[in-house]
Amino acid sequence: MISVYSISLGCPKNRVDTEHLLGSLGVAVQPVEHLSRADVVLINTCGFILPAVEESVRTIVETIDDLSGLRKRPLLAVAGCLVGRYGAKELASELPEVDVWLPNQDITAWPAMLAHALKLEGAVTPGRLLSTGPSYAWLKISDGCRHNCSFCTIPSIRGGHRSTPADVLEREARDLVAQGVRELVLVAQDVTAWGEDIGAPHGLATLLERLLPVPGLARLRLMYLYPAGLTRELLGFMRDAGAPLVPYFDVPLQHAHPDILSRMGRPFARDPRRVVERVRDFFPDAALRTSLIVGFPGETDEHYAALTSFVEETRFTHMGVFAYRAEEGTPAAEMPEQVEDRVKEWRRDALMEVQAEISEELLAVHEGTRQQVLVDAPHEEWPGLHTGRTWFQAPEIDGITYVSGPGVEPGALVEADIVETRTYDLVALV
């Protein structure tokens, strides 16, 4: 057995990569809560945007400092998008204290590389060590991206789109549910692109046909749905499939004005209203989440006003807003008409204020209703209180439901009365 102290930065896809690595070393792995008790310290980094790069580097440097005072120093391994973006050779010259660099070019090779560095004798076998508890788990269905948005570094870091075969994903889904997982959340850079590169006859629907019948699965949630991939055919399949598929749509629209979408390299999404209307044609009561970028090069007051009007009209259930940052190596970083930071930040904050009012109004409708709540974990401070989620709340990104009463425990799916609503959260009693 080896003890591991791990840090996963960035998105859920990184967390899945960490879980696969730790579950595939060919020996039993014991997670520990302090690096002084670890045989190996693993940092899975993010490098998607500059703040993530800075956080990753800061985390590595702070960890090196913490390790320097230990009598027995664990092996330090660094993986993830920071390594993919800057390369192991360049990073090693700046951070020689790191023992092992795990590059993104072949994530499947990580277990063998780490096992070799640890001098482990057991055979490396595919596996997964869950870190999310019994209620939910992410299922990463592909890696990389075939799109070339002008602001995005992902294709250069993660490479082109590569689907994981359906039989592999079905086996993993069955294993996760057998461990007690109630909700599977499908993630990828573009979930709707699954199957395009491996000849799946009906694309994502082919995979869903394999996953939906998994015995014991209570919820199946889809994240990162590319606007162009939400075809009428896919939406029709999803409507007809029904439970355990939840009518939750995470669609990163990024903007609403065609001028800005064109500059973003997303001309296929130049009419986001049609995307929203298409979803609501099939799912009138769908929960809609989106992410938007403000302050993109060339964004004028008129462009921003159009975006604000779009948000007010559409009334998303959940929304994230990001102030644009120029990323080295992307076409957008070289564009003229860069927007001042103070303007970008004001636009972000103002748009989130608009969304806060919308969210509060939409959640208030649920007060007095009865909802199924999937219980995630005990509250850290209040005994007897747990946190969970309704079908319209995705883990770790949306609001939560505070729930208490008989039978409330992690992994339980309970019927509860919504007794109070807040801006982003709910309060429920069984």
Swiss-Prot record:
GO terms for biological process: tRNA modification. Residues 364-430 form the TRAM domain. One of its GO terms (cellular component) is cytosol. [4Fe-4S] cluster 1 binds at C11, C46, C81. It holds the Pfam family UPF0004. Binds 2 [4Fe-4S] clusters. One cluster is coordinated with 3 cysteines and an exchangeable S-adenosyl-L-methionine. Residues 2-119 form the MTTase N-terminal domain. Residues 131-361 form the Radical SAM core domain. It is found in: Cytoplasm. SMART domains: Elp3. Keywords: 4Fe-4S, Cytoplasm, Iron, Iron-sulfur, Metal-binding, S-adenosyl-L-methionine, Transferase. It catalyses: L-aspartate(89)-[ribosomal protein uS12]-hydrogen + (sulfur carrier)-SH + AH2 + 2 S-adenosyl-L-methionine = 3-methylsulfanyl-L-aspartate(89)-[ribosomal protein uS12]-hydrogen + (sulfur carrier)-H + 5'-deoxyadenosine + L-methionine + A + S-adenosyl-L-homocysteine + 2 H(+). Its EC number is 2.8.4.4. [4Fe-4S] cluster 2 binds at C145, C149, C152. InterPro entries: Elp3/MiaA/NifB-like_rSAM, Methylthiotransferase, Methylthiotransferase_CS, Methylthiotransferase_N, Methylthiotransferase_N_sf, NA-bd_OB-fold, Ribosomal_uS12_MeSTrfase_RimO, rSAM. Belongs to the methylthiotransferase family. RimO subfamily. This is Ribosomal protein uS12 methylthiotransferase RimO.
